[in-house]
Amino acid sequence: MNKTIKVIYLLMMLLIVNTCVAFAQSEEKNTQTYNWQAFDIGPAEDYNYAFDANSIKYARNEDGSINKNIIIYQEKKTNNVPMSTEFNYYSITKCQLNIEQTAICFGDESFYTKKDKFRWTDTPMYLTWITVSRDSIGGLRFIQIVEYARAHDDILTSRA
């Protein structure tokens, strides 16, 4: 009987510690300053997409020169469907566009609550360039990022 009580006590302590850790992690705030610019992807979509105008920049080559064919930026995806399990969350994904190949590469995707509390990050198993079609949602986002980069070339160059 004495061992049973000790085991129950140990399990209860582990449960309390795990609960405290989970709450502590959920309280971390997303403190970065963003300047979200919404993508116009048309009506009847379940998600809103936006890019951070504060983070967009050109990539650098290995020799340190600026590569204007690769654009690095962060993208925010928010669910519009109130009955969805994703409705109370949004994600921020690190992205790269390859203008020459009309392709996109998705990096780490971090999830937050609507109140900007960090929840978790998904890291891709491998990074790959995905060709986008101009008629798709990805293609519309691609075109708008490239147009923004061309209109703000000096800003992107200074951030590279």
Indicate where each model-derived feature is located.
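Bacterial N-terminal signal peptides
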Residues: 9-19
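Bacterial N-terminal signal peptides that target proteins for export
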Residues: 1-9
